[in-house]
Amino acid sequence: MRAIEIAVRDVGGFAARDVGAALMRKAFDVDNGPLTDMTAERGERQALSDLFAGTMGTYKNAQSHRKVGLDDPDEAAEILMLASHLLRIVYARRSRTAAP
């Protein structure tokens, strides 16, 4: 999940001090987030912002602040798939946010 945070910072042009769920809310702000797809319906934009922020709060934040046991290999694989999909979304935004 740290890779997602780093990618969002990089692609969105955020500072190192921008972290976690708050960073995701800024990056995917429904009205002016640099990684927000403004062609999507408002509810979908909000849902994507919630997905990114929720992922940070649920997975990255927990791992950052305490030892979280992850003993189930299926669950670990599912979390990796989620992270991979979120990275795909971020990197798809890279060309839209690049300066001409």
Residue ranges and their predicted role:
Residues 64-65:
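Histidine-centered active-site/metal-ligand motif
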Residues 80-93:
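Structured adenosyl-cofactor binding patch, chiefly the S-adenosyl-L-methionine
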Residues 1-55, 68-74, 92-100:
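Amphipathic alpha-helical interface elements
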